[in-house]
């Protein structure tokens, strides 16, 4: 059952990614699908990573855990062994130290930046058009726009919905990934939204 759910979600993400590549006329270096770790929902991220679809990227987002550097190293090592792109959320120093492929910035960090961090790949979280445009001005590689649907990770946040997601995607030239409440059951609703791919937590557990 888990394998089938993951396969359907990965297929939906690849379909979005293919449409995006056709539109922009160039290949994308980033995966079509990303898994976000979570300190509460994925206390053992290594076990979850083992079950991910082939080619699925990983954003290490365990912020408030003991021995964060050691866990980040283990995650980056596991991703390298499975040929997965690993991005570390937060500062670029930890991402560099553990050998990750890049860094992912939460929106509050994105807003404070005036220049792009010196990392091969830099992505950011965005919840508004202002954040999207700031990421674009900095020359980031992609943004994760959320929450698309209602999500346990942010129960009080107002979901964008398909129309809101589509509208914001059109505001930027950056690749935009849909995040927040994404599952194999609703991913197909974003087929015409112009996104570059999908990202999930619970949808990949």
Question: Could you describe each region identified by the protein language model?
Answer:
Residues 51-55, 98, 138, 171, ...:
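Structural motif
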């Amino acid at each position: 059952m888990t394998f089938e759910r993951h396969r359907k979600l990965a297929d939906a993400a690849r379909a979005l990614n293919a449409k995006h590549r056709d539109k922009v006329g160039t290949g994308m270096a980033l995966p079509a699908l990303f898994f976000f770790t979570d300190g509460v929902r994925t206390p053992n991220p290594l076990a979850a990573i083992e079950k991910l679809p082939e080619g699925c990227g990983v954003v290490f987002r365990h912020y408030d855990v003991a021995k964060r550097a050691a866990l980040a190293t283990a995650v980056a090592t596991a991703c390298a062994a499975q040929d997965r792109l690993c991005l570390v959320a937060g500062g670029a120093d930890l991402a560099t130290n553990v050998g990750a492929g890049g860094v992912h910035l939460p929106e509050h960090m994105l807003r404070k930046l005036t220049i792009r961090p010196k990392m091969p790949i830099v992505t950011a979280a965005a919840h508004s058009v202002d954040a999207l445009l700031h990421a674009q001005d900095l020359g980031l590689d992609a943004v994760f726009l959320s929450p698309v649907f209602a999500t346990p990770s942010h129960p009080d946040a107002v979901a964008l919905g398909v129309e809101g997601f589509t509208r914001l995607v059109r505001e930027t030239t950056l690749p935009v990934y849909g995040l927040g409440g994404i599952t194999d059951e609703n991913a197909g609703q974003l087929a015409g939204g112009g996104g570059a791919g999908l990202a999930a937590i619970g949808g990949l557990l």
